[in-house]
Structures are given as C-alpha cells and as structure tokens.
C-alpha cells in the first residue's frame, strides 16, 4: 500500500470573517476548524502531515504545536506561502519537503466536517496511479469549480469566474480535496501558469495536465454536502456549528441517550453516557464529560470536565466547571437548581447541593447537605454534615488559601463563617450566626456571636421636619 502524506492548506486570510484571528482558528464545537481536519487526518495514519501557513502563520503554527503536544502526537511540518498567489502556488511550497514515493492527500483547513471514511475512499480511488478528486453535487454551485466530463471521464475543473454559461450550469463541483501520486503532482505543479481572470496559480489546472499525460482522472463523491462545506463568514460558521451539533446529537440518540430536543443541545468536547440518560433542553457540555446510568440533566445546564455517577440528578441552571481539576458527582447525588461546582469539587454518594450553593476544591462525604445560599472553598466535609443557609468558609487571607475540615455528623447553623484554617469536631454543632476561627471539640455546641441586647427606651433617629 502506498504511503499517504497529508497536505493541509491553511494560508488564507479569511477576509469575510472580519476578525484578527486566523480563519482556521475560529472554533466549531469547541475546537478550531483546523483541529477537526488534523484529527481526521490523524485517523488515516498518514506518514507525515504538512500544513501550509500564510496569514497569521506564527499564531497558527504555535497553536498546532501546542495541540499536538497536548495529544501526545508529533507536530506537523510547516511551509509558508508568502505572498498568497492561489491554491497551486500554495501547494508548490510543499514540493521541497514532499516525498516522491507516496500519495499526496490535499485537504482544506477550513472544511471541518469531512469524515475519515470519505478521505479513505478518495485515497483508494487514487491507488497511487490516478488523480482522484472529491466531488459533490450542489443545488447552488455558485463560486465552486465545475467538474467538466467527457462521458464518465473527468476532463477539467473550471473555476466559477472562468466558466462559460454552459459550464456554470454543471452541478457537480470540486470540493478542494484531492489524492494524487506525489511524483506526478510535482511535475504538474512545475507547469502551472496564472493565465486566468484572477491572475492566480490554480491547483485545479493539474487536471488538464493529467488528461494530457494520459493519467486517469476519477471522481469520488462525498456522501453529503455538509462534509465539504467550508467556512468563509460568521454565518457559514454558525450554520456548520448547527450541522455539527445535530450530527453529534444523532449519534448520542442512536446510543440510547434521550435528548428532549436535539436542536437545543451543544457538545463542545466528548460525552460518554451510560444507559437511560436523560438530557433536557439548552444544555452545553464541554471538555470531557462522563454520565453514568440513569443520570438526569435538567434544562439550561453547563457542564465541563466532569464525572457524574449513576442515578445523579443535575437540576436546572446548574454550572459544573471542572476545567483545571475536574469535578466528580457521586452516585444518587442531587445538585441544583442554580448550583455552581467549580474545579476540584468532589461530591460523595447521596450528597445534596441546593440553589445558589458554590463549591471549589472541596469534598463532601456521603449524605452531606448544603441546601441553599452557601460557599465551601478548600474544605473537607464529612458524612451526613448539614451546612446551613448563608454559611461560608473564609479560606483566603489575601495571600494564601487555607483548609477547613468539617468532620462527620456536624450541624452548621445558618449564616456562619468558618475562618480557615479550622476544624469542626465530629458531631459538633455551630450555632447560627457564629464566626468560628478556632478548632472545636467533637460533640460540643459552639456559639461565637455577640450577645443580644434590647433597649426599651431607645428611639430611632428622625429626620428634621420639612419646613
């Protein structure tokens, strides 16, 4: 089998995006457009990957190196196209680093939804001997190069701006993807000229050279148009985002996940689900999220980098943000509505976290409860603790963060402040309104608040009477 070398064209400016960010670094499904293409190329086990950069080259190359390192993969090779004089000129920059003895698979960095199996068929069509073009039929092919045939054989690709009236009526178009024997590609690139309306070097002109040299030119059709749709504007990016999310929603439902409305679901990472999972509308999942069996997610939740165990319920409007340290929700736990779990939150089985409760870098043991209006930061909370409304851990002294330990079976009354570092002993009770800054013994009642005084003859100050 011939080795495959992937060439990714990513030098364009993307003027219609009206952005300072390189076009291929705009995100779709939480990942840059080009990352989708790179991940697809990696699935083909290519010998090497070469990225053609130009506009925003430093930013793009730096990002791709970092992304490869994060995935434990080798960084791609880079070549620069400066200035940008067309697609043919772009691929000419690859010639010095492209081996002669393989198949060059040429991809576009702004076409994120291409499938690995589609590219594999394209490579197989090439077979190391033919020029294989990925094509698709479009209802409105305006702006695309038309596939001109003689019978079944492809004779040429005519760019839209150079096409005559008859050619503009052709609905089969070239998508920008091709597989070609590398040695022949190099020879044909050397023959390109810019004798056209745009005064650019068109990669598509190699088709006529192939025909003249007696090399078979074959078309490999894409299964659906969305695979080959590119991004040139914010509107097109939004349209592809919806298509991508629908693709992901469909895949999850085929696995048995029950989505209340697949049109109101966003996945910007990876989501693994057990059996009988239910997800209500307008939920966003990012990073790596795992949902166990019988998990229910209420409407309008945002969940990133979290593991949610069997039978847990996440009520409406809950934010779970595990980006740096992850979040774990134990079996049968109840969270929300309007709760916030930040990085490092660890909930044991049957924990209850209610409305307007926030946890960061804190753990709660089995059956512990914080049902409303509370904050726990840098805390270790034991089993069966009841943490009252309005209570907080004061964990930050302005320079360093400190640990609070609340041992098992403690009851913390409402509106308490636990000033870290501090430990509340097992089975103890903290009276409402207390400010606790010293360790307490097990089983005792601790009250740390000012004495209540009532003044019978006190009169409220009055404003002077208006004249």
What does each model-found stretch correspond to?
Residues 26, 112, 171, 178, ...:
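Residues that recognize and position ribonucleotide moieties
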Residues 1-19:
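N-terminal nucleotide-binding beta1-loop-alpha1 segment
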Residues 1-5, 31-124:
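Conserved N-terminal catalytic core of the sugar/cofactor nucleotidyltransferase
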Residues 2, 171-274:
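Conserved alpha/beta core of the MobA/IspD/sugar-nucleotide pyrophosphorylase nucleotidyltransferase superfamily
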Residues 258-447, 452-453:
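Structural signal for interior beta-strand "rungs" in well-ordered beta-sheet cores
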Residues 114-197, 204, 215:
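Conserved core of the sugar-phosphate nucleotidyltransferase
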Residues 21-27, 192-195:
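Short glycine-enriched, charge-decorated loop/helix-capping segments at active-site entrances
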Residues 10, 53, 108, 135-136:
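Short beta-strand/turn micro-motifs composed of small residues
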